[in-house]
A protein has these predicted regions:
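Active-site- or DNA-interface-adjacent structural scaffold in DNA-acting proteins
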Residues: 1-47, 120
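Short, positively charged, Gly/Tyr-enriched micro-motifs
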Residues: 1-18, 103-109, 116, 259, ...
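Short, conserved catalytic/metal-binding motifs centered on acidic residues
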Residues: 32-37, 69, 87, 100-108, ...
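Electropositive, glycine- and tryptophan-enriched low-complexity nucleic-acid-binding patches
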Residues: 51-99
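Acidic, metal-coordinating catalytic cores used for nucleic-acid/nucleotide bond scission
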Residues: 102-110, 128-133
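Short, surface-exposed basic-aromatic patches at helix termini and helix-loop junctions that form
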Residues: 113-121, 143
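An anionic, glycine-rich sequence signature occurring as long contiguous blocks
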Residues: 128-235
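Basic, amphipathic alpha-helical segments enriched in Lys/Arg and hydrophobic/aromatic residues
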Residues: 235-277
Length: 277
């Protein structure tokens, strides 16, 4: 079984997978979440892949259609590289016209945003303190409008509230748009940038009254006309963690696999096919 997967060329098997996805999912719409996953294995291998005391490691970056609940494709991250170089390769290999591509903070790069725009798609990308200047600017923009009662043309807001499991959760999505000026504000480091998004999450424990809040920031090529759609897209991004990566870890026990090299890459594709069937 292991030998069977080891003799198949990963590029060929990936092509078969992509063609199969096209048959199952005729058209991709809505949110396409992109995220990387480290596959750890106990086996040692040669210098072709990253090794260490923990043994074989394989980074795969996957694209997940949140609406269709299916993996659209994946690429291997080269050992001497990272997700930043792998993500554009994956995006360029997919038909994403009209989709909203969501990525964590690793995707907050000029080349990645340019690739998404060139594929006729939009993006929502998390921004964190590893991009210090951009993060501080985004935070300042959102903080200026977060708690204002008045809504002016450049600001829209969507509020949702959920009660359950002994707590009340309130989420406020604030979208601030300066249109084409936004790109200049960020010194053209993010292609197609139109809006900054702030998600303020407030949680109250009913029994104790304990209150916590957190604000997360995003950059997007979408304008501020549909804040509810943006809030929904950000929540849908987590489906790649819950419905793909978690299943690979728990159901298929990917981290306990003894497969290496081609076998590991091919079996990763096979498990994603199995999740859809």
């Amino acid at each position: 079984f292991n030998r069977f997967f080891s003799i198949i060329k990963p590029e060929y098997f990936e092509l078969i997978f992509r063609n199969w996805v096209k048959q199952v999912c005729q058209e991709v719409k809505g949110v396409v979440a992109i995220d990387g996953k480290l596959m750890r294995g106990p086996s040692q291998c040669d210098g072709e892949h990253t090794t260490g005391k923990e043994g074989f490691k394989l980074w795969m970056v996957s694209a997940w259609s949140a609406v269709n609940g299916i993996s659209l494709g994946q690429v291997k991250v080269d050992d001497k590289s990272n997700e930043i170089t792998a993500i554009p390769l994956l995006i360029n290999s997919l038909e994403l016209s009209g989709c909203i591509v969501t990525i964590d903070a690793m995707g907050c790069q000029k080349d990645i945003t340019q690739t998404i725009i060139e594929r006729d798609a939009n993006y929502i990308i998390a921004i964190k303190e590893n991009k210090k200047k951009n993060y501080q600017l985004a935070k300042q923009i959102i903080d200026d409008y977060q708690d204002r009662d008045e809504i002016i043309n450049r600001v829209t807001r969507h509020v949702s509230e959920n009660t359950g499991h002994g707590r009340v959760e309130k989420r406020t999505c604030t979208v601030v748009s300066y249109g084409s000026i936004m790109e200049k504000m960020f010194k053209k480091k993010l292609v197609g940038l139109k809006s900054i998004v702030g998600i303020k999450s407030e949680r109250t424990i009913v029994a104790t009254g304990e209150y916590t809040q957190e604000v997360r920031y995003y950059v997007t090529s979408l304008d501020n006309t549909k804040p509810e759609e943006i809030a929904s897209a950000i929540r849908q991004h987590w489906s790649i963690e819950n419905n793909l990566h978690w299943q690979l870890d728990v159901t298929f026990r990917e981290d306990y696999s003894k497969k290496v090299k081609n076998a590991a890459r091919n079996f990763s594709v096979a498990t994603k096919m199995a999740l859809t069937i």
